[in-house]
Amino acid sequence: MKQGIHPEYKEITATCSCGNVIKTRSTLGKDINLDVCGNCHPFYTGKQRVVDTGGRVERFNSRFKIPSTK
């Protein structure tokens, strides 16, 4: 690598809104705040909700007179 053209790589702390603290390295050079992390994200905690779009599909099919495949 050429000297003097690359940004400085520093250790920073990423703090989540749930209180989880993650130490990492970045060229940003300052600590950051996160909205979600692996400890509080619904996908990783198992609290994910499935959105049912069946009503919208049925409405579309009835609007365009497409027979149901069920």
Curated annotation (Swiss-Prot):
Record text on cofactor binding: Binds 1 zinc ion per subunit.
Entry cofactors: Zn(2+)
Keywords: Metal-binding, Ribonucleoprotein, Ribosomal protein, RNA-binding, rRNA-binding, Zinc
Disulfide bond annotation, renumbered to this chain: none
GO biological process: translation
Entry-linked NCBIfam families: L31 (TIGR00105), PRK00019.1 (NF000612), PRK00528.1 (NF001809)
Subunit structure: Part of the 50S ribosomal subunit.
Name of this chain's protein: Large ribosomal subunit protein bL31
High-level lineage: Bacteria, Pseudomonadati, Pseudomonadota, Gammaproteobacteria, Pasteurellales
Gene for this chain: rpmE
